[in-house]
């Protein structure tokens, strides 16, 4: 974590008044690593938790607006126009979140979507599961995983180093934010539906956690959970 983001996290910590038990634990220094939250199975309900433990997701390059749509709803007083925004955030090293925000103005909807994405951050497994590579570096997914949303189904397949991301543009943005650099993919269904496609990719990444791994697999595929180089937040 760079000094700039350490200072940002400290400012958030000084000004923040937690409203949840997990927030208090972070504020009091009982939890100093984002991995600990997922290991204990806590639910993140305050975006400030991410601002403190994973402040680099606030960098402009670590936030992506994936889709902006205009929604119209008829009410007794006439038409009600609102914006719906789909956004993703990530640290490009094992953590990624996806969120949807609504608002009368685009800027408000974007901010809401980014905050919801922070609350929805997941920790993923990475590694080198490609038989063409076997470098044991966390540049791809360690094994094939599949995600589904609505009619859309996405399958992510380990790729060798240098391959890049063989998937649609929305999928590329999510995978890059998660720290996945090389992957093959198969897609099924109405993939032009941006929201469902994005959620299917996100669910596939989440499903890396549903596969039990052995010490032999960790060694063979170079599997890491979350950050490739875990760090603990300190104010020094």
Curated annotation (Swiss-Prot):
Q: Does the keyword Lipid biosynthesis apply?
A: no
What family classification does the UniProt entry report for this protein? Belongs to the universal ribosomal protein uS5 family.
Q: What protein name does the entry list? A: Small ribosomal subunit protein uS5
Q: Which GO terms describe its cellular component?
A: cytosolic small ribosomal subunit
Q: Which GO terms describe its molecular function?
A: rRNA binding; structural constituent of ribosome
**Record gene name:** rps5
Domain notes, please? Answer: The N-terminal domain interacts with the head of the 30S subunit; the C-terminal domain interacts with the body and contacts protein S4. The interaction surface between S4 and S5 is involved in control of translational fidelity.
Which organism does this sequence originate in?
Answer: Pyrococcus furiosus (strain ATCC 43587 / DSM 3638 / JCM 8422 / Vc1)
The answer on whether this UniProt entry bears the keyword Membrane reads no
Q: Output the InterPro entries linked to this UniProt entry.
A: Ribosomal_Su5_D2-typ_SF (IPR020568), Ribosomal_uS5 (IPR000851), Ribosomal_uS5_arc (IPR047866), Ribosomal_uS5_C (IPR005324), Ribosomal_uS5_euk/arc (IPR005711), Ribosomal_uS5_N (IPR013810), Ribosomal_uS5_N_CS (IPR018192), Ribsml_uS5_D2-typ_fold_subgr (IPR014721)
Q: Which purpose does this protein serve, as stated in its record?
A: With S4 and S12 plays an important role in translational accuracy.
- Subunit comment: Part of the 30S ribosomal subunit. Contacts protein S4.
Q: Which residues form the S5 DRBM domain?
A: 61-124
Query: Which Gene3D superfamilies does this chain map to?
Result: 3.30.160.20, 3.30.230.10
Superkingdom, taxonomy of origin: Archaea
**GO terms under biological process:** translation
Keywords in UniProt for this one? Ribonucleoprotein, Ribosomal protein, RNA-binding, rRNA-binding
Q: Name one Pfam family in it.
A: Ribosomal_S5_C
